Amino acid sequence: MSEIITLSYGSICNNTVTHLYNTQESLISYTPSSKPNHDLQVFLTRFKSTSVSYSPRALIYDLRNGLGALNKYEYHETLPVDLNFSLLSTNTTAPAGAETGAGSSLESGYNLKKSRVEKNEYQQKLDQGVTDGSSLNVNNTKYWTDYNKLIYNPKSLTTVNNFVHNENNHESGYHYNFNSLKYDSFNIGQEEFKACNNGNGGYGYDDNDNNKSIENFRYFLEKTDRLQGLQLLTNLNDAWGGFTSEMLIDLIDEFFNNTSSDKQNLWIYGIMNSTKLSEKTQSIRTKLSFIKTLIELTKQSSLIFPMNLNNSKDESWHNNYSMLTDKYNSGSNWHQSSLYATFINSIWGLNNQLKNQISMTHLQNDIVKLNPNQKIINQIKIKQEKSGNGDKQNQLFGSDLNQFNLKDIVNLKDLSNLGKSSDTSATQREINLGISKNASTNTGNDAYHNFVQNRISSSTSQNEKMMKDKEQEQNGIINNYLNPYIDNIFQVETFPVDILKSSSNAINISTEFNVNDGLKSYLKPYIKLVSNIRNQHREYLDIIEDKEELLEDLNNISQEYSYGYESDDEDYE
């Protein structure tokens, strides 16, 4: 047995792991005669009891009030002796717009009590042993605990005290005593981790345990027989990135200091909470915080998968080539996180399927075999596979032919192909999760140069077709992986399956995650932005710390993703 410990930080990431662990729960066999297809103990810990009972092998971090209706000791008989029961029984917060400051009623941060969040209908039925996801919607899934199925060990759940969860999921959390101070930048996350862990200037964690991060990780580490690696999910565009970076420094120093970097499996799924703001309309402060987070986490990890659901400016969520239906709500963390989870679940399936199991070490070696410094997976896609010999026009334009209009014809590169089956990616439904979007938009070229291409699909026939297509391109290393259960996440009753288009009442997908030269084009405006920061920009320098070091890191990574001759190389000097 080879275990994986998962660490997740913040609301959008915790929603994502909830989808993932609900999928793991669906794999549990409750009858002795059932034959398992997965090694559940890769991601789950089995309880010592007469019944089959599992708990996530995970550390979950959230802001104050971020657990919603869940009391982390609710399903456990005993409470810790030193628990501050006032924090357990009530959620306290200073709401946005409330008066704060010295002498105010909110000075301590504990004087104003918020009414307890009630369990939704799904959780009430789940407590009665009934699993019915039909009641779930965007209005009653404000918290990841609203549709969580597994019972967490109390040591898994940690909330910080200094910042409060914002019920508007697209806005950053705020300081409990100074609501104008947002939990939105790398340096604030760094400061919060230090405050929580040394007690200076803060109240620490929810139970005032200033050593909690190290000791709780140690608890789960000691429960493993043979650690396969760590998989972290964190937000790249708020303060959780800085919090994660500081925690990694401590964890690596305490537990992995004697492990060489090439033998350490430390993956980060960097998630960007999709907002109404495009990358072009984000503030300088937001952009600097993001790029600082990306660079620091890249240096600390062995692989990083940055993901961003904001499509490039010329793409539409609901065009005929998208997998998304008009029921998709970008303002819902339940919806948004399900797409990130769909991709990650394809990898989790490789990690714990009993047949053709692919370990973290195996997959990591395949990806970095050409260049160990190419650790950023910059292109990530979920693709919908065509099923059988179905209607060719349905395959081309979607299941609803009534949606076909003149705009669809204009989008076609070749009108002679109208109504014909096509194997090109332009006519295949997909969701682009990566930070490198459309090649022609970002670079002016028709395609990126791929250094390494990776694909996970459910059948060998799909892999053979992909291999044939990619061989014609003669473009980098190609890795194909088989996961027959890649679609199992759609069978879980808590997954919002109606946001995805289906073909013949089935959703057949494959996933791709590639390393290509698109990252160099992506980093170019950030290099220019950092270069223009001056010494008088104190607010910006607080985020990026050492400007010259950040520029050097950016240029070094950019060069690792260069291919061929580029006339504008001087832009990177």
Swiss-Prot record:
<dbReference type="InterPro" id="IPR029209">
    <property type="entry name" value="DML1/Misato_tubulin"/>
</dbReference>
<dbReference type="InterPro" id="IPR019605">
    <property type="entry name" value="Misato_II_tubulin-like"/>
</dbReference>
<dbReference type="GO" id="GO:0007005">
    <property type="term" value="P:mitochondrion organization"/>
</dbReference>
<dbReference type="Pfam" id="PF10644">
    <property type="entry name" value="Misat_Tub_SegII"/>
</dbReference>
<dbReference type="Pfam" id="PF14881">
    <property type="entry name" value="Tubulin_3"/>
</dbReference>
<dbReference type="InterPro" id="IPR036525">
    <property type="entry name" value="Tubulin/FtsZ_GTPase_sf"/>
</dbReference>
<dbReference type="GO" id="GO:0005737">
    <property type="term" value="C:cytoplasm"/>
</dbReference>
<dbReference type="InterPro" id="IPR049942">
    <property type="entry name" value="DML1/Misato"/>
</dbReference>
<protein>
    <recommendedName>
        <fullName>Protein DML1</fullName>
    </recommendedName>
</protein>
<keyword id="KW-0496">Mitochondrion</keyword>
<comment type="similarity">
    <text>Belongs to the misato family.</text>
</comment>
<comment type="function">
    <text>Involved in the partitioning of the mitochondrial organelle and mitochondrial DNA (mtDNA) inheritance.</text>
</comment>
<dbReference type="GO" id="GO:0005739">
    <property type="term" value="C:mitochondrion"/>
</dbReference>
